[in-house]
Amino acid sequence: MNMTFRWYGRGNDTVTLEYVKQIPGVKGIVWALHQKPVGDVWEKEEIRAETEYIQSYGFHAEVVESVNVHEAIKLGNEERGRYIENYKQTIRNLAGFGVKVICYNFMPVFDWTRTDMFRPLEDGSTALFFEKAKVESLDPQELIRTVEEASDMTLPGWEPEKLARIKELFAAYRTVDEEKLWDNLSFFLQEILPVAEAYGVQMAIHPDDPPWPIFGLPRIITGEASYKKLRAISDSPSNCITLCTGSMGANPANDMVEIAKTYAGIAPFSHIRNVKIYENGDFIETSHLTKDGSINIQGVMEELHKQDYEGYVRPDHGRHLWGEQCRPGYGLYDRALGIMYLNGLWDAYEAMAKKEVGI
């Protein structure tokens, strides 16, 4: 297991690498060029500056999250060709600086969606919350206002240039159903996977969050059947997944221990977090501790250990603790606690395995 920490860059994150370095066991930083407009080529000098800064603190910079996919590609319109070519060049450029995994998603318009960024928990902390009925009755513009008011930092997948075109995008997606979105993902992968494979980069698609349609927009990476369909597109070693327990696990029909058991081999990158699911379909993000939520984090980690998992792992969204003013879900304290819990589980399974063989 290669423990990492997501960081949004200098001037774009309340957490500094000086602080991350003080968390035991963190080997790498998961990063991106968040200032780049979606669809633009990530230039070599920009990549060099960011990776050298990360490496100056003793971290590797082998995982990028995310190189976002332009809406023209998801829509499959006449503009997608140039954006796909830009994406290919970005893959080449990143590989030249040691990047081995690129996380991406194929969610139309919105990235991860929540209705409350700072929902109070019983212990006094706050966390990201999803109210299903509210989303079903909410105008997308209201959701955008909720997100914009929650932080003065741009949230990934909620870029201002995209939100300014929200009505136009919704109109464009009226003709895109799940089947069409799968066709567009297939076209994209058939184009980029030969490049990724040639340059030794694994493309790790992130599940939809939450894993069901919202605002009438299709969602296609929602469960085990999605992974089977993804691999049917191409069995390239570069056609991979990001195992995200909190995203896919928000649907209780998705058994994350079984999914880890079956698909860890094609998951070079894992996001580990817990959510508490309510009977009405709402969910709230909790601590990483297994008993605090609905996902068997302990079982997922045990399964990864059984498979001698060598992929990159990071704690995912954390609660907001001890008065920390931070990007929603991405403070320092709870993610640091999450790392210690995950490392503790891993160490315990390691000790048990050694005891079984008499070491």
From Swiss-Prot:
Metabolic or biological pathway, per its Swiss-Prot or TrEMBL entry: Carbohydrate metabolism; pentose and glucuronate interconversion
Cofactor list: Fe(2+); Mn(2+)
Protein induction: Induced by galacturonate, repressed by glucose.
Catalyses which reaction(s): D-mannonate = 2-dehydro-3-deoxy-D-gluconate + H2O
GO biological process terms, semicolon-separated: D-glucuronate catabolic process
Keywords: Iron, Lyase, Manganese
Pfam families in the record: UxuA (PF03786)
Enzyme class, UniProt record, top EC level: lyase
Extra remark: Member of the exu locus which is required for galacturonate utilization.
Family affiliation: Belongs to the mannonate dehydratase family.
HAMAP family for the chain: UxuA (MF_00106)
This protein's name: Mannonate dehydratase
